[in-house]
Amino acid sequence: MSHITALLIKELRLRTGAGFMECKRALIEEKGDIELSIDNLRKSGQARAEKKIHNITNQGLIFAKIKNKIGAMVELNCQTDFVAKDTLFYSLGKEIILTALSKKIKNIDDIRNVFEIKKTELIVKTGENIKINRFSFIEGDNIISYIHSGRIGVLVSASNLNQETLKNIAMHIAASKPEYLSPNDISDSVFKREYEIQLELAKKQNKSSEILKKIVQGRMNKFVNDISLVGQKFIMDNTKTVGALLNEYNARIISFIRFEIGDKIFN
């Protein structure tokens, strides 16, 4: 044990983030070999990390970047706001998004496989479950990304629209949470479910069938506009809808993606 110096233990701690006694144990077991000790800690750390994988991860950060006409966005989750602010957590998120773009990875399972070891190492260092929760991308000639406070992320692809207006629309999406691009994208099942709810509510008003029909129609028009981007009132000028704004430029939104920390947790 005499060859296991404090300096060696310190080096192993710096490289792994593991505790003093864990590092000392690993070095003793591996006869002072630093690389074998790292592997030793990974193996034991994996066991500890496995115990944490069922912990709910409802904190974290959204990362987004655009490169070569591809916009990518990832939601990296942890358990507490404290870890979300950690530089190691932030660095992992940045590395994930940069790697996805540079290697043109478009599948979340591939992303998870590439970063499984680094994610596990960070679980050991932070003592929290960490999860690559969502990943998505957009392709196009005119894309913009917008991140609000690290907790909301938006990617938007458009045609015939300047970057300033496109950014304003991205900010609108972040704030207004549209679920669909246009009313035409709303599924029949979603529409039917809401219609049945509004019909039952309207019946309680004891109006004639003709008036009930108009009441329900008005509520359904509001419903489809509220959840579709082009039907929403533009937050920077509520005298017009996003659709009307696009018409002014003879432009269109091709697609958009919106992530928000905590709105879809798959633990």
From Swiss-Prot:
Subcellular location: Cytoplasm
Range of residues in the leader sequence: none
PROSITE patterns noted in UniProt: EF_TS_1 (PS01126), EF_TS_2 (PS01127)
Cell wall biogenesis/degradation in keyword set: no
Stretch list, region Involved in Mg(2+) ion dislocation from EF-Tu: 80-83
Tagged with keyword tRNA processing: no
Domain of life: Bacteria
SUPFAM superfamilies for this protein: Elongation factor Ts (EF-Ts), dimerisation domain, UBA-like
Family matches, as CDD domains: UBA_EF-Ts
Keywords from the UniProt entry: Cytoplasm, Elongation factor, Protein biosynthesis
MF (Gene Ontology): translation elongation factor activity
GO cellular component terms, A-Z: cytoplasm
Family membership: Belongs to the EF-Ts family.
Task performed by this protein: Associates with the EF-Tu.GDP complex and induces the exchange of GDP to GTP. It remains bound to the aminoacyl-tRNA.EF-Tu.GTP complex up to the GTP hydrolysis stage on the ribosome.
HAMAP family membership: EF_Ts
Protein name: Elongation factor Ts
Naturally occurring in which organism (per UniProt): Buchnera aphidicola subsp. Schizaphis graminum (strain Sg)
Lineage, top ranks: Bacteria, Pseudomonadati, Pseudomonadota, Gammaproteobacteria, Enterobacterales
Gene that specifies this protein: tsf
